[in-house]
């Protein structure tokens, strides 16, 4: 590397160094600015979180934990990780936090590694009922390495069948029971899960990845008083960078989780991501975050009400969280078709199975909607009522159109863009 090239290495901007990638990122920024994000697992982070994640901490290796690293030069990344840990403990009122997992899936894997042996039995919610891949789906490592007993929801109201959980726990005596899911919109009775676990001597693990921000703000029940261990992502309703975390009130179990994360599953932690987690946790400790989380729930309920008024079914009859799971069968539409037409109209969501869904997993009878991202950009109940009406307009157009919904999509897309421009994001980027 000559001197001129070396000096440019530290000064060239992305637009000059890699224009193709720069343009892709600019296009993604425009997409986020001009579309309404309704994917329940997505959110929009603050400028401060972006800055921390794009900082020089990306250069630093820091295997181990604060004060016990396998590398030198960790004085300042130790500060970042300690801030993240202490803020997480304050946020959730717990005694232990590990902020190193790269994802929620790896946080779950770490708990399995700490508490189970290959071939052990655990219980989790069936993916088809609203669970998660890592809760024992056959295609996932959790379903390959362990014996999985799945529980579901009742046919009549689509709520967790606690009697089934209890009966299966007594029959199969799992070593671990998982509560939580990725498409379950209602409150979960964590105390009842703990009673079931205690009766058979099992650990209770709660995966609150979807609900963490709501839990932190006190608008959704906390699992921490009941669970032996809680895992979560740090994005979704918590509004931080994409990553994972493990929480507990048992420091002795915490030692096992630490060893499972490192050296069990991971090597060097991503210190720039951990710094961004610290920023997000600090933001969530502020009073305005509670108002945000309450708005997330209020907005989701308004959205659900407007969709019902428009002739759609809502799984479980409503929501206690940010998730609105929509059954499209009243309009004779599939989730695959609905996802595509809504995206063409400027609203992104994901196709999702509904309980006892007759369609294939890549087709589905439903879509999953969420309120966190649009609430972050400033949408209130009036805007979510409008969004609900726009969704119905697009879906009704598709139901009438024999597959060509272009006219409705174009008309609604202009309304979506106008609505988004009233609530701009990242004006300085």
Curated annotation (Swiss-Prot):
Catalyzes the reversible interconversion of serine and glycine with tetrahydrofolate (THF) serving as the one-carbon carrier. This reaction serves as the major source of one-carbon groups required for the biosynthesis of purines, thymidylate, methionine, and other important biomolecules. Also exhibits THF-independent aldolase activity toward beta-hydroxyamino acids, producing glycine and aldehydes, via a retro-aldol mechanism. The gene is glyA. It is an enzyme of class 2 (transferase). GO terms for cellular component: cytosol. The modification N6-(pyridoxal phosphate)lysine is found at residue 236. InterPro entries: PyrdxlP-dep_Trfase, PyrdxlP-dep_Trfase_major, PyrdxlP-dep_Trfase_small, Ser_HO-MeTrfase, Ser_HO-MeTrfase-like, Ser_HO-MeTrfase_PLP_BS, SHMT-like_dom. This is Serine hydroxymethyltransferase. Homodimer. It catalyses: (6R)-5,10-methylene-5,6,7,8-tetrahydrofolate + glycine + H2O = (6S)-5,6,7,8-tetrahydrofolate + L-serine. PANTHER family: SERINE HYDROXYMETHYLTRANSFERASE (PTHR11680), SERINE HYDROXYMETHYLTRANSFERASE 1 (PTHR11680:SF35). One of its GO terms (biological process) is glycine biosynthetic process from serine. Pathway: One-carbon metabolism; tetrahydrofolate interconversion; Amino-acid biosynthesis; glycine biosynthesis; glycine from L-serine: step 1/1.
């Amino acid at each position: 590397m000559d001197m001129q090239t070396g000096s440019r290495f530290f000064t060239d901007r992305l637009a000059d160094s890699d224009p193709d990638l720069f343009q892709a990122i600019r296009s993604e920024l425009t997409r986020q600015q001009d579309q309404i994000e309704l994917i329940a697992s997505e959110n929009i982070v603050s400028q401060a979180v972006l800055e921390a994640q794009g900082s020089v901490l990306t250069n630093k290796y820091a295997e181990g934990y604060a004060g016990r690293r396998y590398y030198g030069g960790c004085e300042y990344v130790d500060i970042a990780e300690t801030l993240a840990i202490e803020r997480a403990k304050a946020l959730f009122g717990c005694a232990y936090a590990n902020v190193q997992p790269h994802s929620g899936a790896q946080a779950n894997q770490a708990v399995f590694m700490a508490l189970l042996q290959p071939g052990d039995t655990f219980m989790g919610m069936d993916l088809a009922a609203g669970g998660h891949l890592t809760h024992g789906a056959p295609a996932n490592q959790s379903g390959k390495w362990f014996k999985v007993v799945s529980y579901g929801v009742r046919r009549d109201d689509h709520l967790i069948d606690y009697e089934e959980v209890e009966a299966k726990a007594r029959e199969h005596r799992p070593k671990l029971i998982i509560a939580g899911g990725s498409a379950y919109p209602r409150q979960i009775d964590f105390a009842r899960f703990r009673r079931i676990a205690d009766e058979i001597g099992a650990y209770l693990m709660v995966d609150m990845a979807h609900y963490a921000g709501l839990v932190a703000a006190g608008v959704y029940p906390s699992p921490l008083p009941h669970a032996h261990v809680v895992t979560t992502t740090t994005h979704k309703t918590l509004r931080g960078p994409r990553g994972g975390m493990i929480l507990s009130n048992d420091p002795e179990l915490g030692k096992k989780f630490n060893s499972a994360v490192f050296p069990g599953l991971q090597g060097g932690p991503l210190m720039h991501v951990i710094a961004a987690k610290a920023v997000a946790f600090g933001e969530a400790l502020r009073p305005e975050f509670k108002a945000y989380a309450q708005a997330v729930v209020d907005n989701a309920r308004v959205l659900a009400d407007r969709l019902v008024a428009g002739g759609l079914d809502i799984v479980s009859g409503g929501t206690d969280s940010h998730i609105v799971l929509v059954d499209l069968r009243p309009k004779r539409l599939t989730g695959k078709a609905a996802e595509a037409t809504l995206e063409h109209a400027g609203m992104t969501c994901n196709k999702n199975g509904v309980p006892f869904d007759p369609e294939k997993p890549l087709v589905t009878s439903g879509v999953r909607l969420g309120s966190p991202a649009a609430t972050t950009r400033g949408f209130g109940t009036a805007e979510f009522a409008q969004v609900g009406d726009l969704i119905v307009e697009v879906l009704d157009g598709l139901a009438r159109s024999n597959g060509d919904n272009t006219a409705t999509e174009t008309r609604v897309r202009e309304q979506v863009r106008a609505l988004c421009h009233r609530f701009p994001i990242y004006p300085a980027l």
